[in-house]
Amino acid sequence: MKQIVTVTLNHICPMVTGVTPHVGGPIIGPGCPGVLVDGTPVSLMGDACVCCGPPDMIAQGYPGVMVDGIPVVVQNCMTAHGGVISAGVPGVVIGSATPIKPITMNIRKIPFPKIRTVDSVGAAVTGNSKKMKEAKNNIAELKKETSGQTPMIYNLRWETEGVRLYSDRIDEGTKMVADVTNIPDGDTVKISVLIDEDNRIVKQFEGTVKNGTVEIDWDILSKHFKKEE
């Protein structure tokens, strides 16, 4: 069982830039404002964290619970800098009898830090070599996870000119967009649109993966979703 993580909780970052250890900092979200624990939004995979230098990003999530198609964050999920979220909200846990591994974002979407020679030297000079090694090992583990996990399509949404739609109104020019994990760029994915309890297929779409995302022109207007008598 894992504790659910919310925005404002801290992550711990072992990365070192120059002679400055990152230490870590709070998750700044955006999280999901519509799903709250103790009045605070739950954190989602891809959320940003305060860290030394550029913000860090949560690169993992729990595939068994999704909000708006995005996995929620639980304790021990890792970040792009090689950090980890060591604890969530006490008493708010999810999981099953059989442990489920977290999923990792597409490697193209993870902003891994560039580790320079001066950073390794700075870590040694300041006595932070052990922390730097931990960060490197965690980053290597993230990269390994992205190639070894089951292919997955998630975060399916509709967009118009790059803006996510939350309305049930479907106009021309709308695109169906989804993120993928462990599906190489250039591969074709198929998405079936279902409409009712009988799983009637309205249409099957095909799209090509590019930069860890598939984008498809949505040519089904609202009239297609009226149930046939």
Predicted feature locations:
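Solvent-exposed serine/threonine-rich low-complexity stretches and specific carbohydrate-binding patches
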Residues: R200-I220
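Exposed aromatic-hydrophobic patches
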Residues: V177, T213-E228
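Intrinsically disordered, low-complexity proline/glycine-rich segments
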Residues: M1-Q149
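Short, compositionally biased P/S/T/A/G/V-rich stretches that sit at domain boundaries
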Residues: S147-I170
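Structural beta-strand segments of beta-rich domains
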Residues: E172-M176
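Short solvent-exposed strand-capping/beta-turn motif centered on an Asx-Ser/Thr pair
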Residues: D179-D185
